[in-house]
Amino acid sequence: TDHLTHKLKHHPGQIEAAAIMEHILDGSSYVKEAKKLHEMDPLQKPKQDRYALRTSPQWLGPHIEVIRASTKSIEREINSVNDNPLIDVSRNKALHGGNFQGTPIGVSMDNTRLAIAAIGKLMFAQFSELVNDFYNNGLPSNLSGSRNPSLDYGFKGAEIAMASYCSELQFLANPVTNHVESAEQHNQDVNSLGLISSRKTAEAVDILKLMSTTYLVALCQAIDLRHLEENLKSTVKKTVSHVAKKTLTIGANGELHPSRFCEKDLLKVVDREHVFAYIDDPCSATYPLMQKVRQVLVEHALNNGESEKNGSTSIFQKIGAFEEELKAVLPKEVESARDGVESGNPSIPNRIKECRSYPLYKFVREELGTGLLTGEKVRSPGEDFDKVFTAMCEGKIIDPLLDCLSAWNGAPLPIC
């Protein structure tokens, strides 16, 4: 996001939302990596994010303003003077007005509930992108963390629950104050319905907490999967490079072989291919890694011209040896890398530690004792959701949330 975009729109809520996002994302190692990815392969991800991400300041801004206005209105109401009667001692009068009419409460709660529903809708839209492998830039479908994704439902159940939460939240967004009925023989022919609206808003808050809990656990899962992905990709690159040097560099008679020039293009394949598209069986002929690796070797062979007719300089003759060696080595190396991550000894540290949102991740993972969810473990996603939801209801999440903003001076980043 660029602050100029929001400055030109003038809305204070949008400017505030964008400024907080800018602060959190400033210096993020994930953002830096995304820029590198775009430079390396501009077509690997969309030039523009989808609306749930790209327009989130514009979406949240008006609702921030609504919640703030509702808060001010309720503060005025609870600090004001009720009546029926009001006794004005200075004038010796008993005033029978209508300050008991709690319309500020009813209207404020209706507006707040509408804002809560909109926040929940945005959360669900982002969650749906996160668990969908068509949109999440290489993460596994349903954020499945198992060695065999076919036996791991991942966050499929959580997405169904999120859809249910979101539907109920949208239903609760309907206003209460337009359902007023006359009472007390038409003496109370209009009423605020503030209590009903407040109760429904409390229900909406609880549902938003459930959605926030589910989304937060899913984000931590995605972070850990990115960490796993980075370690696995590094291992695959090293292994492919090692096998290429071993099998493609030297010919049968000890001379340098033309196939040695394939290594650079082989590593490009590893860089550009999503790890989780093949890692559960990296040497399978039906998965993209082996297919594209072979394609590179075949293309080099086709460009080898007349040299292909000579067995000692033929690249085609090297393909079998390369693939056999890779099949013998790669699965073991991949399993070793995965074991290293699971045991807490990864070759590459988790990038989240360099981000301003790390206090929230640390709270969920370390203080609450949650972890990477896989179908191989006996712990269900619901157990982790319960831990986070309980902590949220007890207000324990406020401190780590504020820690994420501890260095923020309350102003947007300068336009440069």
Curated annotation (Swiss-Prot):
Q: Which SUPFAM superfamilies match?
A: L-aspartase-like
Q: How is it modified after translation?
A: Contains an active site 4-methylidene-imidazol-5-one (MIO), which is formed autocatalytically by cyclization and dehydration of residues Ala-Ser-Gly.
A GO BP annotation: L-phenylalanine catabolic process
Q: Which UniProt keywords apply?
A: Cytoplasm, Lyase, Phenylalanine catabolism, Phenylpropanoid metabolism
Q: What is its EC number?
A: 4.3.1.24
InterPro entries xref list: Aromatic_Lyase (IPR001106), L-Aspartase-like (IPR008948), Phe_NH3-lyase (IPR005922), Phe_NH3-lyase_shielding_dom_sf (IPR023144)
Query: Subcellular localization, per the record?
Result: Cytoplasm
| Reaction(s) catalysed by this chain's protein | L-phenylalanine = (E)-cinnamate + NH4(+)
Q: Which cysteines are joined by disulfide bonds?
A: none
EC class of the enzyme, as a word: lyase
Assembly and partners are described as: Homotetramer.
Q: What role is this protein assigned?
A: This is a key enzyme of plant metabolism catalyzing the first reaction in the biosynthesis from L-phenylalanine of a wide variety of natural products based on the phenylpropane skeleton.
- NCBIfam families (UniProt xref): phe_am_lyase (TIGR01226)
**What is the name attached to this protein's record?**
Phenylalanine ammonia-lyase
Q: Which organism is it from?
A: Vitis vinifera (Grape)
In the UniProt record, the gene name given for this protein reads PAL
